[in-house]
């Protein structure tokens, strides 16, 4: 039976992939203005594929046995949505609340609040170890709502994109004559790993689906890592023999190659980032799209000068 609330109008019920998937995807696209966002549209396409699989396999996992999401319905029309995505880290249940969307004509009625509260009650009953969500940094209304429900901002992440095409190295930005760029050596891994863990903390790395132990030069000894190892390359930037940065390049990914940058947080970080990525783009890049995730406030000037654009800025919020 659906749970009813006196306010707002309508009622909440469990998402049913056999009837809700198309309208929910349309709702998400409109609410988050994804039509002109290639990354967002790719995510929607993945959601369509998952919805299709759910429809085909509904007899294996009927809607009554799991809870991928909730919808809000008014007069037979779905006007709100929330998804619950589960991850497991060392057997601990970590939940991500995602795609909280309400149709424009029904915003401000408390639907998003009701959906989020219901999702939190559900996750509490499932004894989720941690509950997280991502929200656009400039979405003040949503952030205030989540703060009232017990969420706190843990960190802010910039998602950068370099579009495919011909790239020309900017001139006059920095004097790079003292830097040496080359293939990463075995001895560089310890330094790289330390800086990666600083830039990409473990408490949110589960979402990025990246395992830095596979960046290790010793990963080749693990037969299970061979596929990923063969699509990774690593480069080191040094100044007078001292490591200043390491760049890892994941290529052959579905929508865009990925870069993972290991740098010390110093006053020279912009210069080191510029030197590291400029050399990579000039000598190794194959003109395809690139995405790079990096902490807010770090290396922003370098990335902008190299032609990267800020795709989105997201706050990671955690329930406390």
What label would you give each PLM region?
Residues 13, 51-53, 58, 152-254:
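Amide-forming acyltransferase catalytic core, primarily the GNAT-like/NAT-type
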Residues 28-74, 78-79, 83, 206-232:
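Active-site rim helix/loop that mediates acceptor-substrate recognition in acyltransferases
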Residues 67-71, 77-86, 96, 101, ...:
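Conserved beta-strand in the GNAT
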Residues 71-73, 85, 98-107, 259-273:
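A short, internal acetyl-CoA/4′-phosphopantetheine-binding micro-motif in the GNAT/acyltransferase core
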Residues 99-102, 108-121, 125, 130, ...:
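Conserved acetyl-CoA-binding loop-helix of GNAT-fold acetyltransferases
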Residues 113, 137-155, 295-312:
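Conserved active-site alpha-helix within GNAT-family acetyltransferase domains
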Residues 123-136, 284-295:
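Conserved GNAT acetyl-CoA-binding A-motif
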Residues 134-135, 152-166, 309-319:
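Conserved catalytic-core motifs of GNAT/GCN5-like acyltransferases
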């Amino acid at each position: 039976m659906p749970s009813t609330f006196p306010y707002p109008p309508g009622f909440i019920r469990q998402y049913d992939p056999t009837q809700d998937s198309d309208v929910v995807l349309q709702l998400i696209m409109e609410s988050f203005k994804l039509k002109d966002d290639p990354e967002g549209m790719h995510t929607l396409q993945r959601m369509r594929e998952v919805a299709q699989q759910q429809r085909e396999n509904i007899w294996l996992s009927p809607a009554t046995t799991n809870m991928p999401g909730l919808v809000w319905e008014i007069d037979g029309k779905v006007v709100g949505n929330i998804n619950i995505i589960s991850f497991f880290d060392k057997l601990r249940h970590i939940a991500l609340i995602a795609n909280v969307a309400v149709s424009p004509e029904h915003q401000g009625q408390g639907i998003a609040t009701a959906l989020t509260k219901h999702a939190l009650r559900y996750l509490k009953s499932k004894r989720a170890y941690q509950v997280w969500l991502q929200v656009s940094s400039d979405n003040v209304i949503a952030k205030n709502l989540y703060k009232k429900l017990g969420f706190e901002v843990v960190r802010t992440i910039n998602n950068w994109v370099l579009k495919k095409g011909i790239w020309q190295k900017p001139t006059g930005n920095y004097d790079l004559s003292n830097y040496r760029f080359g293939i990463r050596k075995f001895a560089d891994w310890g330094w790289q790993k330390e800086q990666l863990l600083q830039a990409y903390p473990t408490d949110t790395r589960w979402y990025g689906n990246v395992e830095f132990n596979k960046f290790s030069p010793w990963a080749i000894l693990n037969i299970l890592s061979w596929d990923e190892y063969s699509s990774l390359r690593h480069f080191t930037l040094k100044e007078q023999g001292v490591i200043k940065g390491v760049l890892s390049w994941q290529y052959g990914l579905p929508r865009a190659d990925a870069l993972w940058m290991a740098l010390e947080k110093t006053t020279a970080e912009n210069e080191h980032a510029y030197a590291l990525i400029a050399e990579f783009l000039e000598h190794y890049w194959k003109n395809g799209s690139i995405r790079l995730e990096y902490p807010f406030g770090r290396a922003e000037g370098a990335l902008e000068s190299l032609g990267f654009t800020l795709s989105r800025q997201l706050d990671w919020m955690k329930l406390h």
